[in-house]
Amino acid sequence: MSNNTNKQYTTQELNSMSNDDLARLGTELDDVTIAYRKERFPVANDPAEKRAARSVGIWAALGILGGIGFLITYIFWPWEYQGHGDDGLMWYTLYTPMLGITSGLCIISLGIAGVLYVKKFIPEEIAVQRRHDGPSEEVDRRTLVALLNDSWQTSTLGRRKVLQGLLAGGAVMAGLTIVAPLGGMIKNPWRPQDGPMDVMGDGTLWTSGWTLQEQGVKLYLGRDTGAIAESHTGESGQHWITTGVSRLVRMRPEDLAAASMETVFPLPAEDVNDGDLYDPQRDVYTNHMHSIHGPRNAVMLIRLRTADAERVIEREGQESFHYGDYYAYSKICTHIGCPTSLYEAQTNRILCPCHQSQFDALHYGKPVFGPAARALPQLPITVDEEGYLIADGNFIEPLGPAFWERKS
């Protein structure tokens, strides 16, 4: 070991040293000695050196190609969403995998090139560092402990138990906040529910109770009567009887006055229990409540004045969705899903009270004010042979606010 590690060198002495001398001095100042060093290719123009350089160059070139491929994919690949059955679905499906493949090729190839360069070109050496036995000097230990104690005492945190608990809880919650997003990988949000589709849809954003119409189920426009189960108190305590209670009933056109609105829900034919089909022994209350609680089931049935109906502007492809003066629009606002529960008969505007979006009922539910950007979806309706209003099809677009997979 050099005896000059503690020497104070002047500028002139340092200037007189070569680069090798300065490098050796630097290691000695850290108590490190280079005991052995061997060049990988001591002979000039060694064929093995050329092969090593070629292998490193190949991996580096692959990394560059991967980076270029990533940029080309990111900029020019058809990334716009395509639904099932649409042209270009395969290209859209490959967009994210191609980003991963090209970026992975770039990073891994450059990493391999770096490792190979170190293994094949950096000289092989053995370095020895002096081991410092025993603890640090007493003065270093005492002063370090004193500084830590002083920091703790001057912070006054030791006597603030409430703040200690809050800070500790905040640290725990911060950790959970970092880990919690991983929960999105546990459940597939597009996996349909177990079992067949019911009056609440299949659990995905594409469906609602009205989707049952596509499966051949006859759906009436059900009016909510507000009927509730009857309460009875017996020896076993209070219980509720739902037999014979019909929460939803069918509607005829004459049940709705001009310039008025009614909220309706999908009522499957098998769950009808009103009028000439009423049976006091049937229990359909639970099914009716499921329809009412369906997250995208609520529909506004609007009857326009005859004069107003003559001024309606139909949406292209939806000219036959109405029945006379009757128009049915989804009650789920296209902004963030609030209920558009207000209808202004004088102006024929549908209002969302949450964020003040307004939709023109005479212009296919087009937004005319507020943050909503899309028209309210329209439900095709007609009447059956008995004169009851029924759904004449399903909505032709997803209901509610926008989400990543929808096109508009």
From Swiss-Prot:
[2Fe-2S] cluster binds at residues 333, 335, 352, 355. GO terms for cellular component: plasma membrane. Binds 1 [2Fe-2S] cluster per subunit. It comes from the Bacteria. Belongs to the Rieske iron-sulfur protein family. PANTHER family: CYTOCHROME B-C1 COMPLEX SUBUNIT RIESKE, MITOCHONDRIAL. This is Cytochrome bc1 complex Rieske iron-sulfur subunit.
